[in-house]
Regions:
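N-terminal alpha/beta PP-like core and its mobile active-site loop of ThDP/TPP-dependent enzymes
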Residues: 2-131
Length: 131
């Protein structure tokens, strides 16, 4: 999101680096011809979730939101099987990623294309017990 209270010398809004990176990732995914994405929303993957939502509003990608990561991953696997196209699954950090594991194994053994995008906590919070 744009931080409206801070501006560069040019008067243009300063964009958070995570937001900028998320927009680049989404643009590359859309340009690769990927048509669907499945998101399990969380605080750490908010920039990706927002960028995918913005692409969805513009009609560039079909957004599917599933709160439960296991459900999300298997739902994406079904889309990949039906379409033959890669399907990104997006989640936050920590144990959320582990919940994708069964579907990722299934995708690997059946040669179905899943693209796993996960967010991580800031470096300053790694190995501190912050969850």
């Amino acid at each position: 999101m744009v931080e409206e209270s801070r501006y560069e010398d040019s008067g243009a809004p300063v964009i958070n680096p995570s937001t900028l990176l998320a927009r680049v990732i989404v643009r590359q995914i859309v340009e690769a011809g990927i048509t669907d994405v499945v998101i399990s929303p969380g605080s750490r993957n908010a920039p990706l979730s927002i960028a995918f939502h913005q692409a969805s509003v513009k009609g560039l990608i079909k957004l599917h939101v599933r709160i439960d990561e296991r459900t999300a991953a298997f739902f994406a696997l079904g889309i990949a099987k039906a379409s033959g196209r890669p399907v990104p699954i997006v989640c936050t950090s920590g144990t959320a990623v582990a919940n994708y594991h069964p579907a990722v194994l299934e995708a690997s053994h059946t040669n179905l294309p899943l693209l796993v995008l996960t967010a991580d906590r800031p470096a300053s919070l790694r190995k501190t017990g912050a969850n």
